[in-house]
From Swiss-Prot:
Residues 1-50 form a transit peptide. One of its GO terms (cellular component) is mitochondrion. GTP binds at residues 66-73, 131-135, 183-186. Keywords: GTP-binding, Mitochondrion, Nucleotide-binding, Protein biosynthesis, Transit peptide. Residues 57-343 form the tr-type G domain. PROSITE patterns: G_TR_1, G_TR_2. It is found in: Mitochondrion. Mitochondrial GTPase that mediates the disassembly of ribosomes from messenger RNA at the termination of mitochondrial protein biosynthesis. Not involved in the GTP-dependent ribosomal translocation step during translation elongation. Its main location: mitochondrion. Belongs to the TRAFAC class translation factor GTPase superfamily. Classic translation factor GTPase family. EF-G/EF-2 subfamily. GO terms for molecular function: GTP binding; GTPase activity. The lineage of its organism: Eukaryota, Fungi, Dikarya, Ascomycota, Saccharomycotina. It comes from Eremothecium gossypii (strain ATCC 10895 / CBS 109.51 / FGSC 9923 / NRRL Y-1056) (Yeast). This is Ribosome-releasing factor 2, mitochondrial. Pfam families: EF-G_D2, EFG_C, EFG_III, GTP_EFTU.
Amino acid sequence: MPWCNTRLRTCGASPKIFLRRVRCPVLLHNWTIGRVSSVSKMILRFLRSYSKRVDITRVRNIGIIAHIDAGKTTTTERMLYYSGKIKRIGDVDHGDTITDFLPQERSRGITIQSAAISFNWRDNYTVNLIDTPGHADFTFEVIRSLRVLDGCVTILDAVAGVEAQTEKVWKQAAEIPKVCFINKMDRVGAGYSRAVKELIVKLKTRVLLLNTPLFAARDSSADPVFVGVLDAVNGQLLEWDPEDPDKISAKAVDKECAHYEELVSAREALVETLSEVDEKLVEYFLGEADGDYMKVPVEVLNESIRRATLSQYAVPVLCGASFKNIGVQPLLDAVVDYLPSPAEARLPELSNKDLPVQHHLKNGLLVNKNANLCLALAFKVTTDPIRGAMVFIRVYSGVLNSGHTVYNSSTGVKFKLGKLIKMHANVAEDIKSLHPGDIGVLAGANVADHVRTGDTIVAHCTSKDGIRSFKKAELALRIHPIDIPPPVFSAAVEPRTLGNKKAMDESLTQLTREDPSLVIVRDEETGQTVMNGMGELHLEIAADRLLNEFKAPVRVGKVAVSYKETINTATETKHSETDDGYSFELEVRQYNEEDKVLFSNGWYPLGSDNNYLVIDPNPRFNEDNWPFPLKYEAFVNSIISCCIVALQRGGKTAGFPLHSCVIHVKRWRLPLDCAAAASILLTVRPLIISALTSLPTSAFSILEPIMNVEVTVQQQDLGSVVQDLTGARKANILSIDDEHHWADAAVTDKDVHLFHDIAEKQYLPPDSTVFQAKLNKEGQTGKIVKAHVPLKEMVSYMNKLRMLTKGRGSFHMSYLGMERASSDRVDGILEDADL
């Protein structure tokens, strides 16, 4: 246990001695030094600079993911405290945590946007941590954070187990190695073993139980309470002092200890699980350990656990109670011991798969065998009231230096870097360089004009303008952009006066720059501006920021469901030819999955409404043989712009934006002197509108968003809740299951059978008497109702659910997809839209 001054005593020894933990090793550049010579100062400056060049194998880029209220921010706060990053522990309820610094976060007690912070832990490991939101409305924050992470800490609530949002983010992080922390073990009803079984079955993973909960009575009359953990790897009992977060006792477990048999069982399960795939461990176990589970050294076990974690064969599981300061140090040890460094993490998805990419201990990644090539991804843009626009990036290869000229391969624009910053939540530290694996910030007056979320930055590691030396294929490198989920709610936004329109547009531009999952649609004919988002809370927060943070002179309308239209048949092929040599021929039709296979080339997504553009190749010209002054990329982007605007004009039934359409440009011709996109815009957009206008109204159908809904209720409330769902809310009930009863989960495929068997065979300690007492008191577990429900019927559902269940019910919903509205629902939809 490197995080405390450890002199172990055996389990049966007395008296009990608490050991005060040492938070974080003191770095050289933090030392206080008296009078020194000029030579010493030079040496000190060199060592300070050198100390910042972190060994890439000792870097961990991690995120904390979980369902809302599982304890992500509370756990983050304890990590920062025990690492020595902060001197006082903040509280979510008091609104003074480090990573929740937005006014809306502090007033509501929830995380709204991801926050990055760096700290050191044990043996000079650098941990770059991103705390992510748990609410489904802010899922885009999770998606873009996951793109730049190498490992994850998944937190489960020991009472609630695996919840709906947990399953969702687990799938989103499918390719990322994880450790799991079962939190809130101090709460009445906490069930460690039940939570582990749900983890195995619902998330389809094997587990490695690194520690198990320890309960003890604090006095003779009290019920047992959660006090610490049994460490199966190190063979210790770790007990935390409830009165002092800085005190912990560590006791070696010998054969005389009451917990020895539990330790042996946990060790046996750990070694057996690892031995299924780790030949090195099997050889050691049968050889030097003589088949004795207790003789396998900690170092050998740790190496095997690390191999299993990196290969994603299994997930290490730990437990604790972050609010009570229990179990956080072992979790931090697991982060640095088992999660990957940037030199071991998954490779980023690159557009050019012909260029070789490999891990490199110095460079992070070696792309095209070019040690001077720096590659970075912009994953977030924010605006600081003092520093202005700030672009968060992850460096994948090479070194990014301030003052160097870089190339945005997503836009084809060169620009000079201003300041580079390392962020510690909302506190900035100016730095000169970002190294492989670093998560940092580009700052400067014009940086937001040059870089957006999802852009790829290419730079030379040593030369200020070295990008000139790169090959064309290297400059064209792009990391796969960040996918943006489709919005399902909308609200009208209008300026308070006509003179406020410019200020409104500027505020909306800034807001969508920071949050691309907000989609702004402007109707040029009516002048109406509509803001689209992921949910009611998402739009509520956006409106709050517009009014209170940006001081925008606007009025925001009532939040409403975002409906779409689609076409049921293809349009006629339309052709347009101009006197100056522009010629286009196209049609619009309904999208189907086969289109992507048929048109593997020239296939471009059009925003987030499942619309696509297909451009057939010209027999005379292509991207490699392009004679026009206008760049090929600008040619394509101009057509994309035309398509998006034309489709947003909407269909004939209700004027809702069009969804699931393909615009197929079959033939095209440009004059050889084509240098600007204006003529393309003037030709293509009216052509698309003409094609759509030629269809009769009957060729259009209204689409409405359908949601995956999970409602958790007690048995006595089940009937009224189901009746309300199937009657008033037009729900399609999929299943009704016992809450937490993992063994009754639907077994529909071979994988699920496999993980049911694994859960049955997994060694688990019996759950605490506190958990059993809760079950006995209630006499029953809850029920989970799973259903597909039109989003229109779920608006303000929480109020109805509280009334039906006397406040005992809860629900979670996520977007499933768009579905054609039945004829009996169309009238209600049109009425809601005031049409």
